[in-house]
């Protein structure tokens, strides 16, 4: 029996994994095994939030070497990460400085100037991408204005997954799904938009033509001397997660739940109407020419920060405590831009409740309950915005990613949205990464074919809405909470 062994490098903003997939084509069985896990976190360098890119590369190589040490012949490798951040290279291909995190404050005020100078409708008409203050469009302008002495030495800019592929193969690539997150790709041409790039103040020569998922970038030479193909997968982690979302029909929506929550639906055409602009809907690139019509929600970033600040290590116990608390005593707008990177998340949440004359959550369970209720209510609002945009309601919501393990949040989401929620798979980004590799190896025909493999190998859990739940009755009041300055508005 012939087996295919593919390795997925899946990097998130808080952790990274090297995962080994084993696929049996005849039985269509697909298994995953974690080979190596490591921490990823922001580090301050000269007062700037940066990524320790060299440490991450070392961890990736450690994971790949571990697979080889087991005597496994790897058929291919794929890398997916978060979007918008980039690495600068000189003409010799050497790294210049450390990549700055999208959570750094250097872009403060830049988006507002772009809108004033270029026009919001023009930017959106060109890119189809939502307005987020950390988009690469604004990061590059901040770079050009704040570090002009640096850019004269730059020859190339690679997005994070493309940089790691370059380090493994020596070949540069600009993968399309991740490139679209920059707000610099023209939605009609699938190439870099000349006007938007000109506004950044950096050279268009830094960027090569974007390539769609499924091409071989080059080869990594393993310690045994074998040349292993490195595939350009859908390198934006959400794009990979959507590929692995077992969407039952065209009327199914998805929610990729992790540090960020990305809620949306698939479409063969983009949505760039005035209504889409008003709702700040994004049209990010997907596999096979599909668009990921979605909206960013701050997600479990709030919980991750609270857990760290409150020294909570047992999440299951915390959720059990949280479940005993009354719903909607404390409600915030998770997308308020005050929560993007506060000095202390717990204190910021408490301040937001205090300022709106609510009870103040003090215990870890109360803070978690505030986050879960608030996210569920925001999910319901965004799902309604998306349904209005497409002109018809959704039949199901598929929650994938690490956040889908939170049964309480899944049920609250079903109750608030009034829709059936199907949770799983957990390892959606990794699976979507593997799916593109298997298509590149000619083991699968397309995304829909791969989704049948996912449903045949991974258990899904269904959550039915309870229409009488208090959270469903609170939605009208929540609308008032959203009258704040939203990050993603």
From Swiss-Prot:
Keyword Ribonucleoprotein carried by entry: no
**Which residues does the record give as substrate binding sites?**
83, 236-238, 296
Per the record, what is one GO cellular component? cytosol
Q: Which cofactor does it need?
A: Mg(2+)
Give yes or no: UniProt keyword Transmembrane helix.
Answer: no
What catalytic reaction does the record list? L-rhamnulose + ATP = L-rhamnulose 1-phosphate + ADP + H(+)
**Disulfide cross-links:** 68-222, 353-370, 413-417
What does the record give under GO molecular function?
Answer: ATP binding; glycerol kinase activity; rhamnulokinase activity
Report keywords, A-Z.
Answer: ATP-binding, Disulfide bond, Kinase, Magnesium, Nucleotide-binding, Rhamnose metabolism, Transferase
Cited InterPro entries: ATPase_NBD (IPR043129), FGGY_C (IPR018485), FGGY_N (IPR018484), Rhamnulokinase (IPR013449)
The record's section on NCBIfam families has: PRK10640.1, rhamnulo_kin
Q: Which family does it belong to?
A: Belongs to the rhamnulokinase family.
PANTHER family of this UniProt entry?
L-RHAMNULOKINASE (PTHR10196:SF93), SUGAR KINASE (PTHR10196)
The name of this protein is Rhamnulokinase
